[in-house]
Regions:
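Rossmann-like S-adenosyl-L-methionine
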Residues: 1-154
Length: 154
């Protein structure tokens, strides 16, 4: 549902989900709503995005894949290191991180804020806004949404 909402404002949207029926539903909803600028992939983000990045570079003569905005909504374990590394390489202007676990959110935000350590030209990110959302009242669970923007000239 995040991808379909974003498709209303974006030139192109790619959605990745590990649950095949969720992708089937997304494709059906896109078709029902006349959304043609969204593509969906079944698999783990930490496998799909690095492969997309590598394939894009090979198919475009070394040109790096780029995204204006990347939205992640990982499971409680947070984002895999390969996924975070690829996001940093793609250098989107903004990252929206939706989290259901504050500990893994803090861990991943630290990595994104520091940027890639081996490449000093790769910028890190700063948190612009964040909001805690109590989607599950009367429980200990809270969702957190963070908007991050790229810091130039690390």
């Amino acid at each position: 549902t995040i991808s379909l909402f974003l498709a209303q404002k974006a030139k192109q949207v790619y959605g990745v989900e590990i649950v095949p029926p969720a992708i089937d539903d997304a494709r059906e909803n896109a078709q029902l709503n006349g959304i043609e600028n969204a593509q969906f992939f079944v698999g783990k983000s930490e496998e799909i995005l690095p492969k997309y990045y590598k394939d894009y570079e090979e198919q475009h003569g070394g040109e790096k894949a780029h995204a204006d905005v990347i939205v992640v909504d990982p499971p409680r374990k947070g984002c895999d290191a390969k996924l975070l590394d690829t996001i940093l390489k793609m250098q989107p202007e903004r990252i929206v991180y939706v989290s259901c676990d504050s500990a893994t959110l803090a861990r991943d935000l630290k990595i994104l804020c520091e940027g890639a350590q081996e490449d000093e030209k790769t910028a890190g990110y700063q948190i612009e806004k964040w909001r805690a959302v109590d989607q599950f009242p009367m429980t200990t669970h809270v969702e957190t949404v963070c908007l991050m923007s790229r810091v130039e000239g690390k």
